[in-house]
């Protein structure tokens, strides 16, 4: 089986907008497909429709889409003078095309526009490629935090907390 070469997000006419309630089923499919790589850590899906609705009450999802559908999304939330970025998910068929980097940049621009002085995020320690990815985007590790007691992790781990000042 051969795969078509991955194209850059600029070639795909990808645009970004805030998700609305009708987008929840597509968001859930995208996030769970992208986070399937975490099944060695957690058994359950990464997000349910109910959880996505709850996230949309405190923040918003920015979605990158094109004529094919949703290509990527990221959750953004204002927390006083800081932004919180989470659930960065890129369609597995489009990973490695720069969409994740593009969407992080859009999220940072959103936070700047809201007057935030920094962006915070957290990744699970078992996803070893993630800290270097975020470091390349200017984020630094500022600490760790335990998983919530309700999360049943199959392997030991913790959150790595990262932050980036916004100019």
Residue locations for each model-derived region?
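Terminal substrate-recognition subdomain of acyl/acetyltransferases
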Residues: 2-7, 153-167
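Acetyl-CoA-dependent GNAT
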Residues: 3, 9, 21-24, 28-93, ...
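Residues at secondary-structure transition points
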Residues: 43, 47, 98, 125, ...
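A generic structural signal for beta-strand entry/edge sites
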Residues: 80-82, 118, 159
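Conserved glycine-rich acetyl-CoA-binding loop
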Residues: 91-105, 114, 125-132, 136
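Conserved GNAT acetyl-CoA-binding A-motif
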Residues: 111-123
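Conserved catalytic-core motifs of GNAT/GCN5-like acyltransferases
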Residues: 120-124, 131, 135, 140-157
């Amino acid at each position: 089986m051969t795969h078509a070469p991955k194209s850059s997000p600029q070639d795909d006419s990808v645009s970004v907008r805030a998700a609305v309630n009708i987008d929840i089923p597509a968001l859930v499919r995208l996030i769970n497909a992208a986070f399937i790589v975490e099944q060695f850590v957690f058994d359950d899906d990464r997000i349910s429709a109910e959880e996505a609705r709850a996230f949309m009450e405190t923040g918003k999802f920015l979605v990158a889409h094109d004529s094919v559908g949703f290509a990527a999304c990221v959750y953004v939330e204002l927390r006083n003078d800081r932004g919180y970025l989470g659930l960065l998910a890129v369609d597995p068929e489009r990973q490695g095309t720069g969409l994740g980097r593009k969407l992080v940049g859009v999220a940072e621009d959103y936070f700047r526009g809201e007057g935030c002085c920094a962006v915070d995020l957290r990744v699970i320690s078992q996803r070893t490629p993630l800290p270097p990815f975020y470091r390349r985007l200017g984020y630094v590790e500022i600490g760790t935090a335990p998983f919530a007691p309700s999360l049943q992790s199959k392997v030991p781990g913790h959150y790595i907390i990262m932050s980036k000042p916004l100019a």
